[in-house]
């Protein structure tokens, strides 16, 4: 779905209206979802993919944040980045927490690629989205469990980035928490890549 969202955003261009973005994202996600129906989607999303007239279903799941990374790269202001992230979430995850998770993730990516420090990213996310980023990974590990909500995935993924030394370390941090590790890893790595760059060995 990350590819589907990125492809849709590039197709409509940087000045597209919110409605145009939402329509393109919904079309592309359905297209990719139907082509790859066994990719481990959640139950409601699987049904959404098949709908002739898909509607948002109030989800606050972490899928909205997992797929949003392109929004953090394609726009020249954090306000536009957040507007587009909100639009990509709204086609399915129109619960306030689902939208917030997508906006926070895209904002962190935008700031990371534009040279903000970890402290600046942390302060912005805490102020704008009211996530508690003061916790440590060591503390989180003592109680963390498998959970798929934005509000219990996105802050932890950002903390995994904040405590990291490089891209690979960020992913190791995320996976070390357990729980929904593929989503944690995807969110954390999307921020880490913007901050550290792509490791040379992967280029």
PLM-predicted stretches and their roles:
Residues 1-203:
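Structured, active/binding-site neighborhoods that engage oxygen-rich ligands
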